[in-house]
Amino acid sequence: VLGQRLRSISPGIAAILLLAVMFFVIDARVSVAGADEVAQKYRFTELEIDYPEGYDQLPKRNIREVNESYHKIRSWISSVGASIAVNDLTGHGVANSLCFVDVRTNEVVVTYAPTAPAADRFEPFLLDPAPLPIDHTMAPMGCVPGDYNLDGRMDIMVTYWGRVPILFLRKAGTELPANEAYHRQEILPQDSPDGRYHGPKWHTNAATVNDFDGDGKPDVVIGNYFPESDVLDPDGQDNVEMNDSLSTATNGGGLQVLRWHAATAGETPSVTFVPERGAVPFAKSTGWTLALGSADLTGRGLPDMYVANDFTFDALLHNVSRPGRIKFEAVYGERSHGTPKSFQLGKDSFKGMGVDFGDLNANGSFDMVVSNITTAWGLEESNFVWVNQAGSEEEALQSLSAGSAPFIQQARPLGMAWSGWGWDVKFADFRNDGDLEVVQTLGFVKGDIDRWPWLQEMAMSNDNLLSNPAMWPNMQPGDDIAGDQPLAFFARTDSGEFTNITEQLGLDVPIPTRGIATADTRATGALDLAVARQWAAPAFYTNEAPDLGDYLNLRLYRPTLDGTDADLPGTPAYGATVTVTTADGRRQVSQLDGGSGHGGKRSFEVHLGLGDATGPVTVDLRWRDLDGDLHSTTQQLSAGTHTLVLTDRVQEVPNR
């Protein structure tokens, strides 16, 4: 009888034991030995950001007005938009200016970094799109600094929900950034006979800028989330929808590829971009895109692109462009019997939220890190760390040309698989020791009532129901999903694994974050950190690590398009790559990043930590000149900051 009773309850005992094992497994996922010891090597101090005069008097919101069909999920619809960028907006040589979107006011704020010296400070201001048409059905989503008309002056592209991006082109003869110092231009011409906007209703959450066709000029790829519809119009048509699947959605806003065509400088500067139809395979151009990144994986001066999509497959797009024609082909990772389906690059069903390229293992090749939703007991996917398996750029080209992506997914062995509801993610070397850290924004909707059960119930529903917003669970002010998750700061331990030390560093503020930007704002070689928070003020952290290594900081320019202003160092060398070899044989590759990720844009300097390396290092430079000709050179450079002008050769000029 006792044996029968034991047999009858054994399934329950097994289930309890399984749950206990799972608890300890999940607990171990986010706990790596050595976190406290590693954290002692870092230190950050938050500094106050200066705002425009009277900014504190502006009304502050905590929710958006949305289409009536979205009202029941308006907190979900209101969950994005905070973004931040750090760059050299003054033109003085140091990246110590900030541009950020504050969703509380729906304003774009331009100010100086708290670390900026007096000479680089200016009156903070709001970037007003007038006289271009804008109304309550539109909202800014991102700042993307860049020199779009190639005149040597830093411009700003602002992306939006509800319209195409606006370019704020810096006028000649203006000394410091100010609202009146910029000429406004639609990125694509729009007719407005009545002063109202009648153009495409893009809903942009991602942008990357690079020379994609190899002509020496910066092209722009826009990633849109919602399809064209009245998302933010409470009086709009009932034309809105949600994703038609949680894993294979194809009804998103997708990609827009814009090829640089022509530009002028002066008091009314201009630039012309041409839409490049068919640049991306149709099946890869209709996703719910949240992040974009690009890097030259093959050494041809043609950057490949990673597309991070919500609700459907991510995509790695191999660049097969020629001057005047941008073209990408989709490539896929290999899958063995032991590879989970979603760990095959380009075939995953996870929620791609952020992406960055960097040389994680310091072997001279670009790896990739991708944010997903990885909340234990909530929605537990895995972040991606795609480690490059190609032995050389030539081998990478051979694989990609055959349609194969030479990457394997290593997030779990490296300790970065699980963190929370991920968004923007960035590589950076905050200690200058030659090892990259990974910073990731986290959190979704902050409130008081836990709504994870509703979300989990929806995740198990039939895909045929999902596109109708009425079938989604309520998500209103007061509801909470992952609302108390602080950003993650992954640092490498002695074992080679990474561990999240955000709590030890005091960065564990329980507010959802969206964008990350890094820059050497003090010209000391230490990368500072700026963070955009959703429905809260952004934060700026100065890097006070106690024992910094040597570094190489390269400011890379090409001559301006007209070459007339001798007071300007030049225009950023979009697409330039740098490989540094130290005396011990260690190789690191990096690039001038013209803009990547989700809600954050790092500065343009190419920063590499050298650790304890002594003496000059070997620097391999590869770039295209303004005519599109590809050049490369190898030279010795000492540690520190160097300003280099790239033509058909390399000329070092004094740092500004």
Task: Explain the meaning of each model-derived region.
Residues L2-S75, S79-S83, A482-Q485, R492-T493, ...:
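Gly/Ser/Thr/Pro-enriched helix-cap/hinge segments flanking short amphipathic alpha-helices
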Residues G34-V38, N106-L127, V164-E186, L232-S247, ...:
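Beta-propeller blade repeat segments, especially FG-GAP/WD-type strand-to-loop junctions
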Residues E53-S83, P131-C143, Q190-T208, N251, ...:
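Repeat-based blade/solenoid architectures
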Residues N96-D102, C143, R153-Y160, V220-N224, ...:
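Hydrophobic beta-strand segments that make up the repeating blades of beta-propeller
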